[in-house]
Amino acid sequence: MFFIVKGRGTLRYGAETRTIRAGDFICCPTGGPETAHQIINDSDAELAYISVSTMMPAEVCEYPDSGKVGAFGGSGASRLRHMTPADAKVDYWKDEA
């Protein structure tokens, strides 16, 4: 969820775009490429927003424009941050005993 504090810009949500401005609350439910979202400052002024998250221990994101998948989670020494091409294929049992 995002709260637009000041400025204006564009929200890209799937294939749609919408103008956003100060005072707007935005909710972007999870899903596939059809729910990918991006906030774009296409104005000449500063765009400021607050992002609110569930802070779940792990997050998987699809990047449809670049064909990647990212997996993120944890903190400190156990932190996970992994990006890979979406079409990379690895068998579940590869290198497993």
Go through each PLM region and give its residues.
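Short acidic-glycine-tyrosine-enriched beta hairpin
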Residues: 8, 14-31
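Surface-exposed, flexible loop/turn segments at secondary-structure boundaries
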Residues: 9, 34, 57
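Short, conserved beta-strand element in jelly-roll/cupin
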Residues: 1-12, 52-54
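Hydrophobic alpha-helical bundle architecture
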Residues: 28, 38-40
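Double-stranded beta-helix
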Residues: 40-97
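Extracellular structured ligand-interaction cores
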Residues: 8, 36, 49
